[in-house]
């Protein structure tokens, strides 16, 4: 019997939290195609609201959903806000590492506390379309916006980054964006949503 217990114990392995959620997407709200799009919108908007609230900024949030591929039911979700933005050094952790956030030890209940939401969206987008999520962030103390395409290495629970750079962020009216965040990802969804 002792040999059996030792053999069984030697077969036990620890799995990364991101690897667990990769196999159990329904825990993150990605259990159906329609709900996946709703979850992605909710997570992005919740993050925008939280950031604006914490920075004491009246939120101005734009959400755009565009159908990209009719045959594969791929849609592109783009959100933009006027929040404080995210410093370049923090972008990869915010979008590419599960259980990373600022609300774990908050006393007051907030929209999100787990540090899972937006990274779950990045992961789901990557798993369903093979594409990374494009992030553009501008903070008030910098003259240009940081840009990067973020994916998730689920085995290591770490971000994968490509196309890093900086660019000026000009608004449609010709003014320069002072601060804010823009996220663009693609996901698979049903061809229609019922109101």
Report each predicted region and the residues it spans:
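Conserved ATP-binding N-box helix of the HATPase_c
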Residues: 34-58, 122
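Acidic ATP/Mg2+-coordinating residue in the GHKL
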Residues: 81
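GHKL-type ATPase core
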Residues: 76, 90, 101-194
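A short glycine-centered beta->alpha linker in the GHKL/HATPase_c
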Residues: 85-87
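P-loop NTPase nucleotide-binding/switch module
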Residues: 8-25
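ATP-lid-like helix-loop hinge signature
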Residues: 48-78
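Mobile ATP-lid/nucleotide-binding loop of the nucleotide-binding subdomain
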Residues: 94-98
């Amino acid at each position: 019997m002792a040999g059996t217990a030792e053999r069984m114990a030697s077969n036990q392995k620890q799995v990364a939290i991101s690897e667990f959620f990769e196999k159990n997407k329904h825990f993150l709200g990605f259990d159906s195609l329609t709900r996946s799009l709703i979850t992605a919108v909710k997570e992005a908007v919740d993050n925008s609201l939280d950031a604006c609230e914490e920075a004491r900024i009246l939120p101005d949030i734009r959400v755009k959903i565009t159908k990209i591929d009719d045959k594969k039911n791929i849609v592109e979700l783009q959100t933009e806000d006027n929040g404080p933005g995210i410093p370049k050094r923090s972008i990869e952790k915010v979008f590419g590492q599960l259980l990373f956030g600022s609300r774990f030890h908050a006393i007051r209940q907030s929209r999100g506390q787990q540090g899972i939401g937006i990274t779950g969206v990045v992961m789901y987008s990557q798993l369903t379309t093979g594409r990374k999520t494009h992030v553009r962030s501008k903070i008030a103390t910098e003259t240009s916006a940081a840009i990067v395409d973020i994916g998730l290495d689920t085995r290591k629970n770490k971000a994968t980054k490509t196309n890093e750079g900086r660019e000026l962020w000009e608004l449609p009216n010709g003014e320069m964006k002072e601060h804010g965040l823009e996220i663009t990802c693609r996901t698979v969804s049903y061809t229609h949503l019922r109101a």
